[in-house]
Curated annotation (Swiss-Prot):
Keywords: Ribonucleoprotein, Ribosomal protein. It comes from Erythrobacter litoralis (strain HTCC2594). GO terms for molecular function: structural constituent of ribosome. This is Large ribosomal subunit protein bL28. GO terms for biological process: translation. HAMAP family: Ribosomal_bL28 (MF_00373). Belongs to the bacterial ribosomal protein bL28 family. GO terms for cellular component: cytosolic large ribosomal subunit. Pfam families: Ribosomal_L28. It comes from the Bacteria. The keyword Ribosomal protein applies. NCBIfam families: L28. InterPro entries: Ribosomal_bL28 (IPR026569), Ribosomal_bL28/bL31-like_sf (IPR034704), Ribosomal_bL28_bact-type (IPR001383), Ribosomal_bL28_sf (IPR037147).
Length: 99
């Protein structure tokens, strides 16, 4: 299981621990990943994602999972998120055709 946010693509970063004597040792900065179920308003169901806390804030800032997926470019999303996005677009097209 990789340590990458499924919605934002945020992953691990490499840096240094720096001592008082300015000695540098390699270290890794990991994103704060949480397993969450995000609800889709248009599909009326929940989807499980492994998301960073920054990603959760971004989703809420954009008005929910549906708006976030529609605004985000495909290359930033995981395969799981892309499946949900395709399903969402399909449901929206069917709703437009029925109306």
């Amino acid at each position: 299981m990789s340590r990458i946010c499924e919605l934002t693509g945020k992953g691990r970063q490499v840096g240094h621990n720096v001592s008082h004597a300015n000695n540098k040792t390699k270290r890794v900065f990991l994103p704060n990943l949480q397993n969450v179920t995000l609800l889709s308003e248009k599909l009326d169901r929940g989807f499980k994602f492994r998301v960073s806390t920054q990603g959760l804030r971004s989703v809420e800032h954009n008005g929910g999972l549906d708006n976030w997926l529609l605004k985000t470019k495909d290359d930033k999303l995981s395969s799981n998120a892309l499946k949900v996005k395709r399903e969402l677009k399909k449901a929206m097209n069917e709703a437009d055709a029925a109306a």
